[in-house]
């Protein structure tokens, strides 16, 4: 860790300017809820009018789901040292079931706060942590089971229903192919009551720690839009606090719905505080990583007491969900012996080593109900880790993987007994024809708790391109019912990702998630596709760029060969040129049909050609031949 950089950060930290630039052609808008403090952000993309050559009409703006937070709102002054605006404190306080702690309940937190050498690293947080009052449960699942619709639930309903509301207004763009949802219960409209019922049933979670008041609420569940997670975090080999905050804001800009801080290097506690205070998206962690650092990396020295203190430490900071590898049981470890790649999960290998060293059952499993007590006191959601996931397609769907999954199903029911929100982590490396079995088995044994998968990677032959090998599997499992997809960057298996890698991974997974929404037939999912297709046909180049997931790259690729501004109104691109543009030719066919008195509305191009008066066309060609001298051949 570079101390001089950290000193600068704690005194004069500044946000990455690339992360706070509004998207070209877009503006941040807010939709008001039933109360003044429910303001749901969306990104509205302005569109040009259709050119007169194509009928000349107004194109209404298109609203899209926005994960970029206050960072792209020009009205919000971003100051990393102060953190993001408080959204949820009033909602939490009015429920009357929490108390403010006079001091941290974590021994480790108190030690860090008492260490003067860390002063230059600390985020200047004046607010004290909250916890449930004795005997109280503050989870969104607990409220949902009691029939309470929280402000978080209303916020989410507005956010998820955004495209549905707009579709009804846009006429020609509202056509959508029926999907195949594989038994998902996707309604025609997302209401606050539907959100409540899905959370109560355990089919969806709202990761929203009561100490993460900067959070813009979101939901993870198979009957909602497919979400994606981006990973950040330092390591022993490098990266500063400043770089991790930068990766957070950058990932959220491009579409990360949640972010996991997987730091394993120095100053994990301080790094996480900076991240959470400047994050509007849910933050997840793997607490066993930090617990391992506390015992100098020696897995055998881990204890329940150290792990418990780590959970409290992170819950007080505001971590929204914990990956906990409680399903790695002693009896499953021998099942991995003949695998090609053994145990590839860091958390899984840590717990397997502990189990073998002590020849005792996993303490995360034996203390699971005590963990639930901590989770419900702060509303931290479980992400039950797949510590025995396959690390190669050769090991996919084996006894170790599915044995652990069965145990995760048992633990899910225990968590639900405590009203603790729970999702299940999944593989991994799985060839395409074996992916659906994973989804079907998870739905069965985990009673439809949300599934959250890393990919899966569909082949192992493409280091450097694993964002693509996994994006294929992610799109498929998202279609089958997976609720959240954990991104993979081009650096997977090779190194720590930088900003460029983070963006590439996020965009790849946004494509996969959206493709899954289309395949499921999620209402309103096709609106953006239709708007972009219409812009493409009408050669509205700027609208094409702005409607895309990555306007910057689309614009740059176009400008490599046609850099002049005049090219952005041309009726062709560099792929086919002016004479061979299929869309230009199609429009000419339509124009000709109109001249012949053929109504082209709703007619396919093949039908259109057949309906043109062939005899009239032949006569026209005969006239041209005679006027040109009736010569059989002409010099060229």
UniProtKB/Swiss-Prot annotation:
Its EC number is 4.1.99.17
The record ties this protein, via InterPro entries, to:
ThiC (IPR037509), ThiC-associated_dom (IPR025747), ThiC/Bza_core_dom (IPR038521), ThiC/BzaA/B (IPR002817)
- Name the needed cofactors: [4Fe-4S] cluster
- Detail which positions bind [4Fe-4S] cluster: 573, 576, 581
UniProt keyword Oxidoreductase present: no
Query: How is the cofactor bound, in the record's words?
Result: Binds 1 [4Fe-4S] cluster per subunit. The cluster is coordinated with 3 cysteines and an exchangeable S-adenosyl-L-methionine.
The UniProt record lists the keyword Lyase: yes
Region span, Disordered: 48-70
Q: What PANTHER family does the record point to?
A: PHOSPHOMETHYLPYRIMIDINE SYNTHASE, CHLOROPLASTIC (PTHR30557:SF1), THIAMINE BIOSYNTHESIS PROTEIN THIC (PTHR30557)
NCBIfam families tied to this protein: PRK09284.1, PRK13352.1, thiC
Instruction: Indicate what this protein is called per its UniProt record.
Output: Phosphomethylpyrimidine synthase
* Source organism of this protein record: Cellvibrio japonicus (strain Ueda107) (Pseudomonas fluorescens subsp. cellulosa)
What is the taxonomic lineage of the source species? Bacteria, Pseudomonadati, Pseudomonadota, Gammaproteobacteria, Cellvibrionales
């Amino acid at each position: 860790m570079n101390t001089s950089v950290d000193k600068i950060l704690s005194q004069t930290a500044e946000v990455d300017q690339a992360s706070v630039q509004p998207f070209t052609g877009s503006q941040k808008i807010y939709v008001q809820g039933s109360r003044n403090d429910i303001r749901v952000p969306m990104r509205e993309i302005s569109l040009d009018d259709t050119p007169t050559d194509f009928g000349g009409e107004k194109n209404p703006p298109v609203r899209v789901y926005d994960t970029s937070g206050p960072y792209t709102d020009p009205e919000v002054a971003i100051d990393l040292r102060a953190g993001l605006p408080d959204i949820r404190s009033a909602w939490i306080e009015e429920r009357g079931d929490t108390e403010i702690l006079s001091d941290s309940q974590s021994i480790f937190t108190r030690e860090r706060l008492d260490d003067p050498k860390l002063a230059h690293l600390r985020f200047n947080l004046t607010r004290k942590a909250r916890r449930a009052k004795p005997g109280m449960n503050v989870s969104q699942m607990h409220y949902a089971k009691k029939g309470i619709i929280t402000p978080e639930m209303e916020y989410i309903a507005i956010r998820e229903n955004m495209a549905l509301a707009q579709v009804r207004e846009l006429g020609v763009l509202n056509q959508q192919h029926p999907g195949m949802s594989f038994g998902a219960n996707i309604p025609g409209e997302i209401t606050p009551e539907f959100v409540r019922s899905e959370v109560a049933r355990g089919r969806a979670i709202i990761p929203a720690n009561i100490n993460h008041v900067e959070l813009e609420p979101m939901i993870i569940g198979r009957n909602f839009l497919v979400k994606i997670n981006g990973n950040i975090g330092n390591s022993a080999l490098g990266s500063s606090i400043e770089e991790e905050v930068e990766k957070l804001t950058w990932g959220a800009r491009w579409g990360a719905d949640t972010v996991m801080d997987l730091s394993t290097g120095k100053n994990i506690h301080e790094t996480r505080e900076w991240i959470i205070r400047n994050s509007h998206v849910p933050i997840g962690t793997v607490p066993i990583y930090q617990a391992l650092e506390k015992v100098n990396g020696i897995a055998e020295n881990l204890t329940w007491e150290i792990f418990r203190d780590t959970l409290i430490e992170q819950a007080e900071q505001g971590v929204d969900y914990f990956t906990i590898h409680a399903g790695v049981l002693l009896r499953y470890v021998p099942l991995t012996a003949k695998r090609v790649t053994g145990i590839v999960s860091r958390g899984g290998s840590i717990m397997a080593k502990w189990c073998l060293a002590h020849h005792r059952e996993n303490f995360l499993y034996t203390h699971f109900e005590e963990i639930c007590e901590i989770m419900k006191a702060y509303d931290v959601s479980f992400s039950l880790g797949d510590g025995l996931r396959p690390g190669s397609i050769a090991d996919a769907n084996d006894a170790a993987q599915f044995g652990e999954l069965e145990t995760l199903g048992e633990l899910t029911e225990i968590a639900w007994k405590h009203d603790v929100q729970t999702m299940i982590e999944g593989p991994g490396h799985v060839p395409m024809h074996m992916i659906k079995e994973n989804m079907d088995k998870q739905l069965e044994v985990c009673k439809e708790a949300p599934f959250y998968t890393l990919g899966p990677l569909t082949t192992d032959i493409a280091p450097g391109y694993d964002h693509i090998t996994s994006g294929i599997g992610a799109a498929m499992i998202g279609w089958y019912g997976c609720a959240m997809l954990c991104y993979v960057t081009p650096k997977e298996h090779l190194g720590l990702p930088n900003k460029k890698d983070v963006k590439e991974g996020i965009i790849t997974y946004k494509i996969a998630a959206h493709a899954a929404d289309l395949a499921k037939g999620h209402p309103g999912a096709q609106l953006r596709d239709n708007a972009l297709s219409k812009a493409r046909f009408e050669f509205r180049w700027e609208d094409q760029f702005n409607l895309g997931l990555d306007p910057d790259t689309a614009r740059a690729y176009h400008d490599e060969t046609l850099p002049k501004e005049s090219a952005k109104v041309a009726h062709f691109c560099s792929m086919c040129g002016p004479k061979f543009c299929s869309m230009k030719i199609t429009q000419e066919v339509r124009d000709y049909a109109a001249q012949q008195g053929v109504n082209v509305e709703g007619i396919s191009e093949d039908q259109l050609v057949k309906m043109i008066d062939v005899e009239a066309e032949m006569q026209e060609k005969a006239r041209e031949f005679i006027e040109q001298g009736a010569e059989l051949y002409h010099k060229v």
